[in-house]
Curated annotation (Swiss-Prot):
Biological classification of the source: Bacteria, Pseudomonadati, Spirochaetota, Spirochaetia, Leptospirales
One Pfam family per UniProt: Elong-fact-P_C
Annotated function: Involved in peptide bond synthesis. Stimulates efficient translation and peptide-bond synthesis on native or reconstituted 70S ribosomes in vitro. Probably functions indirectly by altering the affinity of the ribosome for aminoacyl-tRNA, thus increasing their reactivity as acceptors for peptidyl transferase.
Protein name in the entry: Elongation factor P
Coiled coil: none
Amino acid sequence: MTLGITEVKKGMVLKVEGDLYSVVKTEFVNPGKGSAFIRTKLKNLTKNSSIERTFKAAEKLESVELEKRNMTICYTEGNDIIFMDSNDFEQMPVSKEYVEDILPFLKEETPMEVTFYEGKPIGVIPPNFSILEVTYAEEGLKGDTSGTAQKRVTVETGGEINVPIFVKQGDVIKIDLRDLTYVERVSR
């Protein structure tokens, strides 16, 4: 769908020079002299980078519709994660690169939203939090409490994370997947 610059809004997906971009920020400028333009901040959906781009009033932009499907992780195979569609149970490989940094904190059957463009997966939106059991934790040292004392633990999926020294083996913890930080202990 073709759009004029005044129709571009935050959250839209545009095709610019063959790449897909999500509109992060827009600023419409109408100077007293000259023609209007729009200043945008765009996030590349396939390369995970951001650019700032200015479009002139006469330019036409191409808006694209993305398909979003609720899927769950089945297993990993090579460089792919095999996802299963929650509606029709179809299995589909998706590149690990979309969730590589948080993969050690994801259990099988974790629900996620997978984004498709023209039938091909182009992104994965993971949940914000993961609740996991601590399988290995060293004992915290008594008196080691200056500042925010932390130690490294291993969780049931094999991932390692820094936590406060009071967390021990067998505890269930909540991890924020957006920045891979400890949130809290969770009661069973």
